[in-house]
Every structure is written in structure tokens, then in C-alpha cells.
Design a protein with these regions (language model features):
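Flexible coil/turn and secondary-structure edge motifs
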Residues: 1-157
Length: 157
């Protein structure tokens, strides 16, 4: 198994997008990239902890590649919006790829360069590509939120 971590706005919809992918064995929503330990949702929402809402994805590389997960990531949000997605704004909603090894870093940077060059997006991609620091699991009520609520989408593109 391998691990990938992505921030792309509200983590509920992002988690749901990855859960649909064959080869993804588990997902967990949480907080990453901040300067406090064990933050709560309420603390992250103050925009003072520095954390992003993110999804940690465990996957089987023999069934789905990291590049394929990157494609899902870029399709599940607008990577040209800085610190916001749809009606949600603040640094917790930033777009970021948290890599776990040098290959993931290289593939993420290559994907961004290719998308920028393609002209698919009218503005430059602002997705951060950074090494994965400690990931803090979000409260249980956030896990598999769409499944628990019986809904299929929020404001994903």
C-alpha cells in the first residue's frame, strides 16, 4: 500500500471523490500543514492554526497510480483559487499536494507544469507542493461525511 495526501477545499467532497476510485483502499479526512498539534475543527476554522482540510488516501499502486490520483485531485476542485473553493474561504481551504516521497513530488510538479502549459485553466495553478508533515485525523463526524448524510456532492466543479 502507498499513501497520498491532498488538500482541495472542503474535505467532505474531496474524500468522497477519492473513495470512488478503484484501488483506493481507505480514506481519512483531517488537518495538515499547520503549526499546532492535534487541532480541532473549531480551531482550524479560526484560520489561526495554519492547517488545511485534507484527505489522506491509502491506495494499491498495482490498481491505481499516483498520477491517476493526481488527475482526480485536479478534477475535484479549482486549483487556481488561492485559499478558497466555492463559497468556502480561508487558508484551511487551500489547494495543496503533500508528497510522501521524491517520486510523488516530481509527479506532482510535472502534473502542474503540464496543466499550466495546456491552457485548460485560464489562471495559473496555485497548488502548493510540500513535504507531508504530521496529519491529524479530523473528528469522527467528518469521516465519510457524505455517506453518513446520504448526499453526493457539495460544490465540487
Amino acid at each position: 500500500m502507498a499513501k497520498a495526501t491532498f488538500a482541495a477545499g472542503c474535505f467532505w467532497g474531496v474524500e468522497d471523490a477519492f473513495r470512488q476510485i478503484k484501488g483506493v483502499t481507505s480514506t481519512m479526512v483531517g488537518y495538515i500543514g499547520g503549526h499546532t498539534q492535534n487541532p480541532t475543527y473549531k480551531e482550524v476554522c479560526t484560520d489561526r492554526t495554519g492547517h488545511a482540510e485534507a484527505v489522506e488516501v491509502e491506495f494499491d499502486p498495482s490498481q491505481v497510480s499516483y498520477k491517476e490520483l493526481l488527475a482526480v485531485f485536479f478534477q475535484s476542485h479549482d486549483p487556481t483559487q488561492l485559499n478558497r473553493q466555492g463559497p468556502d474561504y480561508g487558508t484551511q481551504y487551500r489547494t495543496a499536494i503533500f508528497f510522501h516521497d521524491p517520486t510523488q513530488e516530481a509527479e506532482a510538479r510535472e502534473a502542474i507544469a503540464a496543466l499550466d502549459k495546456s491552457g485548460i485553466f485560464k489562471r495559473p495553478i496555485v497548488t502548493q507542493v510540500v513535504g507531508a508533515p504530521e496529519f491529524y485525523r479530523a473528528e469522527e463526524y467528518h469521516q465519510k461525511y457524505f455517506e453518513k448524510q446520504g448526499i453526493r456532492a457539495c460544490h465540487l466543479p
